Amino acid sequence: MLSLDFLDDVRRMNKRQLYYQVLNFGMIVSSALMIWKGLMLITGSESPIVVVLSGSMEPAFHRGDLLFLTNRVEDPIRVGEIVVFRIEGREIPIVHRVLKIHEKQDGHIKFLTKGDNNAVDDRGLYKQGQHWLEKKDVVGRARGFVPYIGIVTILMNDYPKFSYAVLFLLGLFVLVHRE
């Protein structure tokens, strides 16, 4: 049985080995965080990787697709570009396409978005009284994607017990593989 074998392995470990395994797990977690921060610096985006959570961008992107983002300040936003934006009062960013751009005489640019699979533009999603998005609302712009790889993230959000199981299995893997 897996659980009994695992417990026997843990019991056979001396304190030094157990301490080493805990440190090893800590190194894995801290390495992942450093890689994330590095990606943030390189891409200029607060969230360089996002998962598509709905079918609003089909057929371009499907639920569970993993998007790679950049957010260079100097690059102008263009019609047809896919952006990830955050709306005040909503925790989760939205992935949609730029539908229209509105440029004022002073050079200030605002834009309107829409999901490819939606019948109407996103004005109904914006906060009340807001009709356009601004560059400050953009988290990033889609530069590439990997299909369906983010479905694990969706499962972890939809089923919290699944996320605990994944974390437990990762911890178990680190403890059992001592090399």
UniProtKB/Swiss-Prot annotation:
Pfam families: Peptidase_S24. Coiled coil: none annotated. It is found in: Endoplasmic reticulum membrane. The keyword Transferase does not apply. The active site is at residues 56, 96, 122. Residues 37-179 are lumenal. It is a single-pass type II membrane protein. The C-terminal short (CTS) helix is essential for catalytic activity. It may be accommodated as a transmembrane helix in the thinned membrane environment of the complex, similarly to the signal peptide in the complex substrates. This is Signal peptidase complex catalytic subunit SEC11A.
